[in-house]
């Protein structure tokens, strides 16, 4: 029974993550209701089952409990803002969104308690979902009818609905793909799928034209190389996938039907057919290079592998630094970069944006958030109210719901208390994730290392975008955090606690009602 309950939890959680990624509807509150209600009810049932002994009991160590307590305090403070919010309905919506993410966190804890191989199953499942996401995104370019509104704005964003969010998911695919590819114990087809994930994620990442996404992807790779012992294997797989991906993406940027706005359907369809051919050819090259690199590395003895990893990594780093120096010399240096970053002009939506340094209005929004904080330093204006609070301050007609920086958003909307609680919860979660990895061994530890990149990457991306407002980015991050914080805890039978089970069910129903309430 415990095994069946654990599989049901894992399957239900996977289905909810798939819904979040493919049908999250961007920042839509309507989609959040259905996904959040299902997550809340499943979490309530799961906790009730755990308290009755149907699954493993949730166990959190001291750092995990501290992270959970601080997160709950952050949500409680956002809810307390209903008493002074300038837009209580928006504050209520912010609180509801946070409670939905808490439900995903609880599901992660339940999955971790239900299965001793929860980390491996979660990493494989998330990698599979991300392969589906990037595959569907590129399929929308091959068949334009699958890409809603792709004729008006060409930047790749389906199925998530927002290009920067899709770029973030592409970045998450790199550590997971490298984890799959570098595990020689896995069957050949599974490792080949990992290579395809790396290749397709790299192509899709470029076609989002997201500069922040590229930065987060680079950090993701660096985190994985720092954490893993298979550095040479990872570098080989990375080069094998990204070289043909760069060629395919570079070719795609020359086709009007793929990257230019307002193109007629025949042009988009024709270029889509060519893209299909080029993608397949690139995939063949990527798989061939990956196989060749793997065979070459396999011939080396372990000592040589350990020696060549830093050498190859150093060479790639030197090339990157040389490119950065050349770009700095050609673009005028840091002072000009700062001036361009703080400029108020909007960035183009095409491939040329990748070479631009403008913050695309973010600098102005950050200044507005700071000004709002100075006027309301203690309590803020109420969670979710930035769009209204900035109206007397804004100097352009550009509308934004958030300042594209979660820390400044918390500062403006919830004051110093909200920011302090949010920062403390984030740091506690990072520390708890790191502590949890020490409890894992073997394959579970390798999977945990890949998953452990998700939380810091989410926090990094949230410093210059609206990740909190997107269930497609937040649900996986909170679920993974739960899986990690529940890692390594002993699976022990304990007496059933029916009162706690009833309380868990009541909380799940209460959250569902809160989502439905106006």
Q: Can you describe what each PLM-predicted range is?
A:
Residues 173, 405-406:
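Transmembrane beta-barrel architecture of outer-membrane proteins
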Residues 162, 351-400, 407-410, 414-421:
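TM-adjacent membrane-interface loops and short helices in multi-pass inner/ER membrane proteins
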Residues 48-56:
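C-terminal ends of transmembrane helices
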Residues 491-518:
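N-terminal alpha-helical interaction modules that lie
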Residues 99, 136-147, 323-375, 379:
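Aromatic-rich transmembrane-lumenal/periplasmic boundary elements in polytopic membrane proteins
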Residues 59-68, 306-307, 498:
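Interfacial transmembrane-helix boundary/kink motif in multi-pass membrane proteins
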Residues 1-25, 33-49, 72-82, 88, ...:
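Alpha-helical transmembrane segments of multi-pass inner-membrane proteins
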């Amino acid at each position: 029974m415990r095994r069946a309950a654990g599989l049901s939890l894992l399957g239900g959680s996977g289905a909810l993550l798939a819904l979040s990624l493919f049908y999250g509807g961007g920042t839509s509150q309507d989609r959040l209701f259905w996904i959040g209600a299902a997550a809340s009810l499943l979490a309530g049932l799961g906790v009730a089952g755990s308290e009755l002994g149907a699954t493993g009991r949730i166990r959190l160590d001291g750092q995990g409990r501290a992270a959970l307590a601080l997160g709950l305090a952050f949500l409680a403070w956002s809810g307390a803002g209903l008493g002074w919010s300038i837009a209580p309905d928006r504050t209520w919506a912010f609180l509801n969104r946070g409670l939905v993410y808490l439900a995903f966190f609880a599901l992660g804890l339940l999955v971790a308690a239900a299965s001793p191989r929860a980390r491996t199953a979660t990493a494989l499942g998330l990698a599979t979902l991300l392969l589906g996401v990037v595959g569907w995104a590129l399929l929308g370019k091959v068949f334009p009818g699958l890409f809603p509104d792709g004729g008006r704005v060409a930047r790749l964003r389906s199925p998530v609905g927002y290009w920067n969010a899709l770029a973030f998911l592409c970045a998450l695919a790199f550590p997971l793909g490298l984890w799959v590819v570098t595990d020689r114990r896995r069957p050949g087809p599974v490792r080949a799928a990992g290579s395809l994930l790396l290749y397709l994620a790299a192509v899709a990442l470029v076609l989002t034209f997201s500069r922040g996404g590229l930065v987060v992807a680079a950090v993701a790779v660096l985190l994985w190389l720092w954490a893993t012992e298979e550095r040479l294997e990872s570098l080989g797989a990375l080069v094998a996938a990204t070289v043909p991906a760069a060629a395919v993406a570079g070719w795609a940027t020359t086709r009007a039907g793929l990257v230019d706005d307002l193109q007629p359907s025949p042009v988009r369809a024709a270029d889509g057919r060519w893209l299909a051919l080029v993608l397949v050819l690139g995939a063949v090259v990527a798989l061939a290079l990956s196989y060749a690199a793997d065979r070459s590395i396999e011939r080396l003895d372990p000592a040589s592998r350990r020696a060549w990893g830093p050498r190859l990594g150093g060479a790639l780093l030197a090339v990157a630094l040389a490119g950065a120096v050349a770009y700095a010399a050609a673009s005028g240096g840091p002072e000009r970069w700062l001036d361009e970053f703080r400029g108020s002009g909007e960035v183009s939506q095409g491939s040329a944006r990748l070479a631009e340094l403008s913050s695309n209005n973010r600098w102005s929004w950050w200044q507005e958030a700071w000004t709002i904080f100075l006027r309301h330093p203690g309590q803020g204006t109420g969670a979710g109210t930035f769009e209204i609070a900035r109206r007397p301050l804004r100097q352009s007609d550009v509308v934004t719901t958030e300042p594209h920086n979660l820390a400044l958003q918390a500062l403006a909307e919830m004051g110093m208390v909200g920011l302090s609680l949010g920062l403390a919860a984030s740091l506690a979660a990072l520390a708890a994730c790191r502590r949890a990895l020490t409890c894992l061994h073997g394959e579970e530890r390798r999977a945990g290392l890949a998953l452990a990149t998700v939380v810091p990457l989410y926090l990094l991306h949230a410093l210059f975008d609206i990740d909190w407002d997107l269930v497609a980015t937040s649900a996986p991050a909170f679920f993974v955090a739960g899986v990690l914080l529940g890692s390594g805890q002993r699976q022990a039978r304990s007496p059933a606690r029916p009162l706690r089970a009833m309380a868990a069910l009541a909380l799940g129903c209460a959250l569902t009602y809160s989502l439905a309430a106006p």
